[in-house]
């Protein structure tokens, strides 16, 4: 079981709700994935409609909602968005996202740290999206974030685990869960992150933009489970030279 804040999760695959062609397909894909936590932008939710097309299928399936602060350009905007989400959705969980550059959507480390400090003081369970920066992730942990969410590659790029070396350091030194977020474009990418020791991954575009999102969701579920199983089993170490699996020297000497 994965514990973050006051919740426990059987599934280590977290999902997003954007880019699906319709809410029914979104709900089916998330349900098939086994995900128990789905992130969503507050701007996509009609907080005055209790039968909101996005919310209801997820709530009915028992999926926990993780509102994000997507669109915030600074700490002040992010704190305000989080407060709105808490009031509208009744949750103190928030995925902290601050990316002022609309082209590359790179997270602002300075504003993210400032917002995280304020939100933790205000009683939020904060999961910050950030660069794969070991120093920053440690600082976010120290100010009280419940987990850290370093990027694998730019949002929506599907480039996979481009920040591998830095993620290894983050995972090694973290005392809170590490959720690899952004850039995961194939089930193999998710498996690789889990094999490294990541506690979970968050996937959106790779599922939502697939030709068959439901089938892809199942593929990601299996990849995350197998990657976690491999990590726990203990991967064989790498060496720089060949090591025969069936040495023949003694056998040949006897001929």
From Swiss-Prot:
Coiled coil: none annotated. Keywords: Cytoplasm, Schiff base, Thiamine biosynthesis, Transferase. It catalyses: [ThiS sulfur-carrier protein]-C-terminal-Gly-aminoethanethioate + 2-iminoacetate + 1-deoxy-D-xylulose 5-phosphate = [ThiS sulfur-carrier protein]-C-terminal Gly-Gly + 2-[(2R,5Z)-2-carboxy-4-methylthiazol-5(2H)-ylidene]ethyl phosphate + 2 H2O + H(+). Its EC number is 2.8.1.10. GO terms for cellular component: cytoplasm. It is an enzyme of class 2 (transferase). One of its GO terms (biological process) is thiamine diphosphate biosynthetic process. Pathway: Cofactor biosynthesis; thiamine diphosphate biosynthesis. Signal peptide: none annotated. GO terms for molecular function: thiazole synthase activity. 1-deoxy-D-xylulose 5-phosphate binds at residues 156, 182-183, 204-205. The active site is at 95 (schiff-base intermediate with dxp). Transmembrane segments: none annotated. Catalyzes the rearrangement of 1-deoxy-D-xylulose 5-phosphate (DXP) to produce the thiazole phosphate moiety of thiamine. Sulfur is provided by the thiocarboxylate moiety of the carrier protein ThiS. In vitro, sulfur can be provided by H(2)S. Homotetramer. Forms heterodimers with either ThiH or ThiS. This is Thiazole synthase. It comes from Vibrio parahaemolyticus serotype O3:K6 (strain RIMD 2210633).
């Amino acid at each position: 079981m994965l514990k973050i804040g006051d919740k426990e999760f059987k599934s280590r695959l977290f999902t997003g709700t954007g880019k699906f062609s319709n809410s029914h397909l979104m709900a089916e894909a998330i349900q098939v994935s086994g995900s128990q936590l789905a992130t969503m932008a507050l701007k996509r939710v009609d907080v005055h409609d209790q039968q909101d097309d996005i919310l209801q299928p997820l709530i009915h399936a028992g999926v926990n909602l993780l509102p994000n602060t997507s669109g915030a350009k600074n700490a002040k905007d992010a704190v305000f968005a989080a407060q709105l989400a808490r009031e509208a959705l009744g949750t103190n969980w928030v995925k902290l996202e601050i990316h002022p550059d609309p082209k590359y959507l790179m997270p602002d480390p300075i504003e993210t740290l400032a917002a995280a400090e304020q939100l933790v003081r205000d009683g939020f369970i904060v999961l910050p999206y950030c660069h794969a920066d070991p120093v920053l992730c440690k600082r976010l942990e120290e100010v009280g974030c419940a987990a850290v969410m370093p990027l694998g590659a730019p949002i929506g790029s599907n480039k996979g685990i481009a920040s591998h070396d830095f993620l290894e350091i983050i995972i090694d030194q973290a005392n809170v869960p590490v959720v690899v977020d952004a850039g995961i474009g194939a089930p193999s990418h998710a498996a690789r992150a889990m094999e490294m020791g990541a506690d979970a991954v968050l996937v959106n575009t790779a599922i939502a933009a697939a030709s068959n999102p439901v089938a892809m969701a199942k593929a990601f579920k299996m990849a995350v489970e197998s990657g976690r199983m491999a990590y726990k089993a203990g991967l064989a170490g790498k060496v720089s030279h060949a090591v025969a699996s069936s040495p023949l020297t003694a056998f040949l000497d006897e001929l």
